[in-house]
Every structure is written in structure tokens, then in C-alpha cells.
Swiss-Prot record:
Organism expressing this protein natively: Oryza sativa subsp. japonica
EC class (word): oxidoreductase
Protein name: Ent-cassadiene C11-alpha-hydroxylase 1
Induction behaviour: Up-regulated by methyl jasmonate.
Compartments where found: Membrane
Membrane topology designation: Single-pass membrane protein
Record flagged with keyword Heme: yes
């Protein structure tokens, strides 16, 4: 190593130590103490507690010792972890505006994505308000969703056809649903099947999106020691930049083909891309906005819904009595109807309860997307949340809070039947919040709450589901593993048996 690099490293470490010592257990300028937490070690803080496969479990265990509002030092980054419904309500109702910015992983700074993405820019930014308004009024409106409902029904039909072709065989359910949902999302947005499609473009797009998802959950020294970001020591931002450039190039080709289609006065595809290009033509958004929206839908939409449905099926196979009850409801409501339609799901309250209970127990976004305190003055549980800190809502722990739920660690869908009007997906009382709450509520919720019960109803109405290899319900492993999302530690395998 050259002398200049050695001195740079030692200088960086010296600054880190001084900065660390200056922040140790100090009281906030307003007089309120910072939340309690585990004693940080020199330089690394509490990073030694962050390893393993179930970070959200560790945070819940630490909260039992230090309290529902807790400080965690990850390197030099101050994190405030909220783990109870009461504390979450206080944070969302009193300080939604103060906490409405996002803590941005350095990986997503590649290509300037975080500086313009609706996922990361602060909600106080006029661009965020404009983009959120466009999604709410042109993409995820009842009218817009109704327009592409035939596409969704056709793609769910394709998924059922795939499962029929493999009836009686062992199927990796997560993989099958991920494939089906990638096609549903891609066809809804720009009328192209991404999986099992002959074009090289489709295969390249699927591969690069999978690559980007895989890097999201990797620990990055740039996030723990922000002053080291310019060095990108692990090369993760450079690696991601190459993938971003590739995915934006592929999606740019899709946009160019559609624009040529429009110039030739060919019939409309009646998908989300047509709606976005109409807005672009009117000057309300630009090409980069369209690219970002398409990318966000791919990275978040299909993956989250597929993982959720895998969790639901795991709990149903582990609880055959619940599955029998859900299938009985389907028979009572649908009778001899062979094919489930999307609108049928609204008439299936117990099936909806099954979905919600699985999401309560196993939220895919166990820690939601991290918030960022943009100003001082935030107090939660009597403690100061300092400006510049990352705020983590442990949704997994909050939705298992014994102060809010009876038998919180058990799979009991009936609780959502009894309290259905009070427990929707919007997290208003922070008791049930798989999609977050407040102004940063997941914008794709209107699509997800239509698609997931529709697919679940189709799977249970079309097939009986068996376990492979002599397994019993007790053998189903619902252990969790946290990477970029909360996933099954053991991928779920099951055998679809066609109902005659």
C-alpha cells in the first residue's frame, strides 16, 4: 500500500474515533436523553450485534432489555429503533413530517437514483409530491387499475396453467409465484412477459433486476461510516452503477419501441406505460421519471408479493384446519364456478383474514424502509430522536406486540374477521402495518391488495395442496431469514393436486 493511502486510512480512523467519542451517550441539546441501548464498542458501535440471519429478531430481543425506543450505533451511524405499537403511534401521529425523509443506502446513490427516486427523496420535496400525485391519480387509481384488470386476470390464469402442467409434482412455490408475478407486473406496466419469453431483452432485464435485489441486503461500510462513502471501499456502488445503467438501457429500449408504436398510430396497449407516456407528452413528467417508476415497480412489486404469498402458503400447509376453512368459504361463495375472478376476492372475508394474519406474523418488510430525522424536536417515549439519525420501525415486533395482540406468536386468522373494519392495510393505528404508515405508505398498496388475495383464492380453488415426501404439517418449517427482506429460511415445496 502506498504511503499516501496509509496516511489516508489512519487519518480516516482518527476522525472516526474522535467523532465516536464526541457522540457517546450525550444528552440531546434540548435536554432530553437519547434512548437507551446496548453499550457501543469503540469504533464499531453495536455492529457486532447486527450479524446473523434474523436481525429483526435480535432487535426485538434487545428492545425487551432496553425498551421499545432504543438507540443502536452501527459504526458511526445513530439508529433509533421503535418496537412497540404505542411508540409507533406517537412517532407517526406527532412527527410524521419530521421523519418523512428516507435514510438512503449508498448502493442506491448509483446513477443519482436516490436523488430523484420517489422512494428516497423527502416528502417535503416538491418533486416527491408531484410524483406521488401522478401515481395516485394516473397509475394506482381505481380507474387505472380497472383498465388493466383483464391483464392481471390473464396473467394469473397463466400461473394457474403452469401449476396445472405440474399437478402431482413437487413445486418450489416461491419460484413459481415470483415468475408469475414478474410477468403480471411487467405485462401490466408495458405488455411484455419478462420470464419464459424468447427475447434476449426480457432475459437480460430479469437477470439484472435479480442482481440488484441481491445486493440490497449486503452490509456496506459506506453506510456505517458515511465519511468513507467517496472511497466506495467495497465497490458496491460501482457494481450497482453498471447494473443500473444496464436496466435503464433495456427499459429505455422498451420506451422507444412504444413511442414508435404510438407514432405509427397503432392501437393502444391500455397499460401503465401508455398512461405514463401520455403524461410525458403533456410535460408533466420526463423520460427519467418514467424509467424510475418502471424500475421501482420491478424491484419492489413482484418480489414483495411473491414472498408474501409463499409465507401464506407455508402457514396454510402448517395449519391444515385453516386451509380447510378457507377452501370451504371458497366453495360456499363461488359454488361450481371454475375460474376465480379478481372481484371475487372481496367476497371472501376469511381468505382475506388468512392473508392479513400471515402478513402480521411474517411481514416481508420486517423493518420497513428506514426513515431519517431531518430536524430536531422529535421525542418518542420521552426520549430525543436527534437530527441526522436513522429511525427503524421494527414492524415485525410491533405486529407481535403483546400489548396489542392476544397470543401474538400464533397463527389465528379469526382475529382479522372479528376486527375486519378496524384493521386494513393502511396502518392507521400502527397495530397492523405491513405496508408502513403515514405519508410514506407504500404507493403500490392498491395493486397489492387486489393481486394477492386474487392469486391466493385461485390457488386454493383450483388445487388441493399436499406436502412432498411424506412430510406432515408439523414438518413445515416457518423459520425466518432476513436478507434484503424477511424470507423463509427453507424455501417452500408443495404438490398441487388438481380438483376435478
Amino acid at each position: 500500500m502506498e504511503n499516501s493511502q496509509v496516511w489516508l486510512l489512519w487519518g480516516a480512523l482518527s476522525v472516526a474515533v474522535l467523532f465516536y467519542l464526541s457522540t457517546l451517550r450525550r444528552r440531546h441539546a434540548g435536554g432530553k436523553p437519547l434512548p437507551p441501548g446496548p453499550t457501543p464498542l469503540p469504533l464499531i458501535g453495536n455492529l457486532h450485534l447486527a450479524g446473523g440471519t434474523s436481525f429483526h429478531h435480535k432487535l426485538r430481543d434487545l428492545a425487551r432489555v432496553h425498551g421499545p425506543v432504543m438507540t443502536l450505533k452501527l459504526g458511526l451511524a445513530t439508529n433509533v429503533v421503535i418496537s412497540s405499537r404505542e411508540a409507533a403511534i406517537e412517532a407517526y401521529t406527532k412527527y410524521d413530517r419530521h421523519l418523512a425523509a428516507r435514510a438512503t443506502p449508498d448502493t442506491f446513490r448509483a446513477c443519482g437514483f436516490a436523488d430523484r427516486s420517489m422512494v428516497f427523496i423527502p416528502s417535503s420535496d416538491p418533486r416527491w409530491k408531484a410524483l406521488r400525485g401522478i401515481q395516485g391519480s394516473h397509475v394506482f387509481t381505481p380507474r387505472g387499475l380497472a383498465a388493466v384488470r383483464p391483464i392481471r386476470e390473464r396473467k394469473v390464469g397463466d400461473l394457474m396453467a403452469y401449476l396445472r402442467a405440474h399437478a402431482g409434482e413437487e413445486v418450489l412455490l416461491g419460484q413459481a409465484m415470483h415468475t408469475g408475478l414478474l410477468n403480471l407486473v411487467s405485462f401490466s406496466y408495458f405488455s411484455i412477459d419478462i420470464v419464459d419469453m424468447g427475447s434476449q431483452m426480457a432475459r437480460d432485464l430479469r437477470e439484472v433486476v435479480d442482481d440488484i435485489i441481491s445486493v440490497v441486503g449486503k452490509p456496506n461500510i459506506s453506510d456505517f461510516y458515511p465519511f468513507l462513502r467517496p472511497l466506495d471501499l467495497q465497490g458496491l456502488r460501482r457494481w450497482t452503477t453498471k447494473r443500473f445503467n444496464r436496466v435503464f438501457s433495456i427499459m429505455g429500449d422498451i420506451i422507444d419501441r412504444r413511442l414508435a408504436h404510438i407514432r405509427d398510430n397503432k392501437p393502444s396497449h391500455n397499460d401503465f406505460l401508455d398512461s405514463l407516456l401520455e403524461l410525458m407528452a403533456a410535460g408533466k413528467i420526463d423520460r427519467v421519471n418514467v424509467l424510475d417508476m418502471l424500475f421501482e415497480a420491478f424491484v419492489a412489486g413482484a418480489d414483495t408479493m411473491a414472498l408474501t404469498l409463499e409465507w401464506v402458503m407455508a402457514e396454510l400447509l402448517k395449519n391444515p384446519g385453516v386451509m380447510a376453512k378457507a377452501r370451504a368459504e371458497l366453495r360456499d361463495v363461488l359454488g361450481d364456478k371454475e375460474v376465480v375472478e379478481e372481484a371475487d376476492a372481496a367476497r371472501l372475508p376469511y381468505l382475506q383474514a388468512v392473508l392479513k394474519e400471515a402478513m402480521r406474523l411474517h411481514p416481508v418488510g420486517a423493518l420497513l424502509l428506514p426513515h431519517f430525522a431531518v430536524e430536531d424536536g422529535v421525542e418518542v417515549g420521552g426520549y430525543a430522536v436527534p437530527k441526522g439519525s436513522t429511525v427503524l420501525f421494527n414492524a415485525w415486533a410491533i405486529m407481535r406486540d403483546p400489548a396489542a395482540w392476544e397470543r401474538p406468536d400464533e397463527f389465528v386468522p379469526e382475529r382479522f374477521v372479528e376486527r375486519a373494519p378496524l384493521l386494513d392495510f393502511r396502518g392507521k393505528d400502527a397495530e397492523f402495518m405491513p405496508f408502513g404508515s403515514g405519508r410514506r405508505l407504500c404507493p403500490g398498496l392498491p395493486l397489492a391488495e387486489r393481486v394477492m388475495p386474487f392469486i391466493l383464492a385461485s390457488m386454493l380453488h383450483t388445487f388441493e395442496w399436499k406436502l412432498p415426501g411424506g412430510m406432515t404439517a408439523e414438518d413445515v418449517d416457518v423459520s425466518e431469514k432476513f436478507k434484503s427482506a424477511n424470507v423463509l429460511a427453507v424455501p417452500l415445496k408443495a404438490v398441487p393436486v388438481l380438483i376435478k
